[in-house]
């Protein structure tokens, strides 16, 4: 922290965040995963070979939903991990989006559980998560997950809306 400003650096020593803002048009690596932001400083891609973390427990999420959503979040949103905590995904805004709590805790979690079983079975699992935005909103309308298990690719799209 210099002059009250917080600077955040990735695994390679590259600056990717200042205070509560991810830098625009930036690629950064956190815990072995590669992330990319767009011109608005929104995460547009998170990818890497999934690894199961080697410690128990879950650290507190570092950033508020307000900081992550920039005012575009909904009351029903969670701070959703792009790369799940069980895969050693970061617990900061560099790996988070405003995600509908029903989607986050049910369908998205079910996919993470399925992928964790594949990793535990010794399979090579690579994932690319791409939030899809409309306009300049920091809340994605959907999340596209492309995953490859031992060379076989699949795609799932999760609308970021609660089913009525």
Functional labels for PLM-detected ranges:
Residues 1-20, 25-27:
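Long, low-complexity, intrinsically disordered regions
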Residues 22-164:
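Domain-level detector of nuclease and nuclease-like folds
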């Amino acid at each position: 922290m210099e002059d009250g400003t917080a600077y955040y650096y990735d695994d390679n020593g590259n600056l990717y965040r200042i205070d509560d803002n991810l830098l625009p048009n930036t690629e950064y690596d956190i815990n072995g995963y590669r992330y990319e932001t767009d011109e608005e400083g929104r995460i547009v891609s998170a990818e890497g070979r999934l690894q199961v973390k080697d410690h128990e427990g879950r650290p507190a999420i570092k950033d508020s939903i307000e900081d992550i959503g920039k005012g575009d979040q909904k009351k029903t949103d969670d701070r959703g991990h792009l790369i799940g905590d069980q895969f050693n995904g970061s617990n900061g805004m560099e790996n988070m989006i405003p995600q509908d709590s029903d989607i986050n805790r049910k369908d998205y979690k079910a996919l993470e559980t399925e992928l964790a079983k594949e990793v535990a079975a010794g399979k090579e699992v690579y994932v690319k998560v791409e939030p899809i935005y409309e306009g300049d909103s920091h809340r994605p309308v959907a999340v596209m997950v492309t995953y490859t298990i031992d060379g076989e690719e699949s795609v799932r799209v999760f609308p970021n809306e609660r089913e009525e």
